[in-house]
Structure formats: structure tokens, C-alpha cells
UniProtKB/Swiss-Prot annotation:
Protein name (record): Uncharacterized protein YDR249C
Length: 373
């Protein structure tokens, strides 16, 4: 009765009166602290231990709890290699912030994915008889991916020098469908030298006019692999885009928007189309320029942007330079294009006698049936 710890009384001095009642003192921290050393005392066995038992017994080791390794524990370089081998799997980037920071787009990472994804492997399609230069062959679907298309435009000096050929789209589709005749030689070398054998430029170049102004060197280099087979589907839309760019630019107009740049871009389009002379074979570009200057942007010609574009020239002087550069042929007494009814219908609507005299002076013959209709 009255023992808190076995064999020890709860009171050392029965005569000493505690400030606390006995039942409260026994459970208090004061009493427990007094006897805590008894709880920590190691219980030893009185049984003797033999020498054999001492050699066999080993000290017990604490078990360590290791955290499970995940993909995030790999070095960043390894994670990027995995990303490249997946050919840029988008879901990896969106896993969490860590993966997003590791796989942020950079030229180094994107170029590795580009080679992994768009490099042509002849063995994959069983093509063994192939004639090509020693550098890389790229499949044409590269131009369908906006990211890698922009990568090629922005870094063409580095990427294009490592590309010897672009596989023709028809051949690639036949290989995918199993219709390609692998017994015949695939001669890619002749396709790079003969304009008739070159493929048409990808659709991106027909839909993005700015390329012919801001990426001229890239377009010129790609002219070694492609031919712009429908240049007049580009020239007139490019002129319209160019004038729209002048009108929409702020007060700090880009130095690229000058009439010299306009002519240089048209020259480039003619060059990659395989034209041997820098002359236009359609009247549509001229009618586009006249319509824009006399109707669409007639009220904007006094703005700073158009003054910068014209460089102290009148619209008539600009049209004269355009006709002399792309239409005038001194060896012809009558210019067939400048005598087209389309241009004379537009001249009738413009009703500028100086412009009519200019066209006549350059070989145009008035279409009186149109003029007085």
C-alpha cells in the first residue's frame, strides 16, 4: 500500500510533512524527478556469458529509412536526354515546376529534339540504295511544326549547314504507306541541282509574308533545296502586307520598311522562283501598287511613316521606278503587259493623266474600249 515504485516508499521521512497532500505529491513531477534515475538504470543479467556467445553476438544497427528515388533525383542533363529521346513529349514539361525549369526551351535543347524527331533514317523504311551527300537528311514535316520552323528561321546559319537534303514529301508519304519502291535508287543529289526536280517551298512561305523581309538569307539558302513555283501567289500579298506594315507601325518605323527593301524582297521572290531575269510576268503586282497608293492609303501618304517609306518621292515617282525595274523593256515598242485591259481599267478609275502618260511612255497601248466604257 502506498508504493509508487516497487520497493520504495513514497515518503522518505514519515515525520516530515509535505506541502502537498500525499496522493498529489506521489503523482507530481517533483517526486518522479527524484526517482527518474531508477527508470534509466540498465537491467543486467546475472547469468554468465560464455566466450562463444560473446563472439557470436553483434551490436544491433539502427534501420535507416531512405526516401524513394524518383525521376527528379536524376541530374538535369539526364532528364534532358530523356526528354530528347521522347522527341519533346509535352506532358514532361507540365509535370511540375521542377521539370518546367529543367526543360525550358533553349536552342541547345530544341535543336537536339529537332535532330531526334526529324532526321531521316533510311533503315527505318528499308531504303538502302540512296545517293546523297554526307550530311543530314531531314523529313519535310519539320515545316509543319511552328516551333521547329521558327527555330530553323532564327538559327539557319548553324542548322542549314548541317542539312544536305530535305526528303521530298511524295517520297516520304510513299515510305510511310509502304508504296515506295526500295529497289530503285533514291537520287537526292540531282534534286538539289536541277530546278525542275526541286520541290515547291512549304506552305509556310506562302502564308507568312514577313519571312521575305526579315529572313531573306534563310529564304535564299533554302532556295538550294526548294523552288517557289507560284511566285505571283506571294508577290501581290507581300506588297499588301508591306504597305499595311508601314501604316500600322508606330512613330519609330523599322528601317526595313523602305521602298529599297520592298524591291529587294521582290527580287528575292523572283530569285527563289528560278526566274533568270528580274522582270515580272504578271500585271497584278503593278495594279496592286497603284491601287494601294491611289485608293487604300491615299489619305495616309502625308504621315511620317509613308514619308520615310517614299524618301522624298511622290507616289508617281515610286510607280515609275517600279515599272522601269520590273516591266519596261527598251527593245519592245509595245509592252504586252502594260497594254493589258486590267491596268487600263484601273487607270480609268484613277484618272491621273501623268500616270497614264507614264504607262504609255513605257510601252503601254491604251485600251480605248475600256477607257471610254
Amino acid at each position: 500500500m502506498g508504493y509508487i515504485l516497487t520497493g520504495y516508499s513514497s515518503r522518505h521521512d514519515k515525520r516530515k510533512k509535505h506541502a502537498l497532500p500525499l496522493h498529489r505529491y506521489a503523482s507530481s513531477s517533483i517526486n518522479l524527478q527524484h526517482h527518474v534515475h531508477l527508470l534509466e538504470t540498465r537491467v543486467s543479467s546475472k547469468r554468465p556469458i560464455s566466450e562463444d556467445q560473446r563472439t557470436i553476438r553483434l551490436p544491433a544497427k539502427k534501420l535507416r529509412h531512405h526516401q524513394k528515388l524518383t525521376l527528379q533525383d536524376l541530374p538535369v542533363e539526364i532528364i534532358q536526354h530523356i526528354f530528347v529521346f521522347t522527341k519533346g513529349e509535352p506532358s514532361m514539361v507540365t509535370l511540375n515546376r521542377f521539370f518546367y525549369s529543367c526543360l525550358k526551351p533553349s536552342f541547345s535543347l530544341l535543336s537536339k529534339i529537332m535532330w531526334e524527331k526529324y532526321l531521316f533514317d533510311p533503315l527505318e523504311f528499308g531504303v538502302s540504295n540512296i545517293k546523297a551527300y554526307s550530311r543530314n537528311i531531314v523529313i519535310p514535316t519539320l515545316f509543319e511544326h511552328e516551333t521547329f520552323f521558327r527555330l530553323l528561321l532564327d538559327h539557319h546559319p548553324i542548322l542549314l549547314k548541317n542539312i544536305s537534303h530535305f526528303l521530298p514529301r511524295k517520297h516520304y508519304q510513299d515510305m510511310q504507306n509502304g508504296d515506295f519502291d526500295t529497289s530503285k535508287e533514291l537520287d537526292l543529289c540531282s534534286m538539289n541541282t536541277e530546278d525542275t526536280s526541286k520541290e515547291d517551298f512549304p506552305k509556310n512561305f506562302y502564308n507568312n509574308m514577313h519571312i521575305f523581309l526579315t529572313r531573306r538569307e534563310c529564304v535564299k539558302s533554302l532556295g538550294n533545296h526548294f523552288t517557289l513555283k507560284n511566285p505571283y501567289d506571294v508577290i501581290s500579298p507581300f506588297i499588301e502586307w508591306f504597305f499595311q506594315g508601314i501604316d500600322m507601325q508606330g512613330t519609330d518605323l523599322s528601317p526595313k520598311f523602305t521602298f529599297v527593301s520592298l524591291f529587294e524582297s521582290i527580287d528575292l521572290i523572283l530569285y527563289v522562283s528560278g526566274s533568270t531575269v528580274q522582270k515580272l510576268a504578271s500585271i497584278e503586282p503593278l495594279t496592286t501598287v497603284i491601287f494601294l497608293l491611289y485608293f487604300t492609303y491615299a489619305d495616309s501618304l502625308g504621315s511620317l511613316n509613308f514619308e520615310f517609306f517614299l524618301q522624298n518621292r511622290s507616289r508617281l515617282q515610286l510607280i515609275e521606278k517600279f515599272i522601269l525595274k520590273y516591266y519596261y523593256n527598251p527593245s519592245l515598242t509595245e509592252n504586252e503587259l502594260l497594254s493589258d485591259s486590267t491596268i487600263w481599267d484601273l487607270l480609268r478609275r484613277v484618272s491621273d493623266l501623268k500616270l497614264i502618260d507614264l504607262v504609255v511612255k513605257c510601252g503601254g497601248r491604251p485600251q480605248y474600249g475600256v477607257m471610254f466604257a
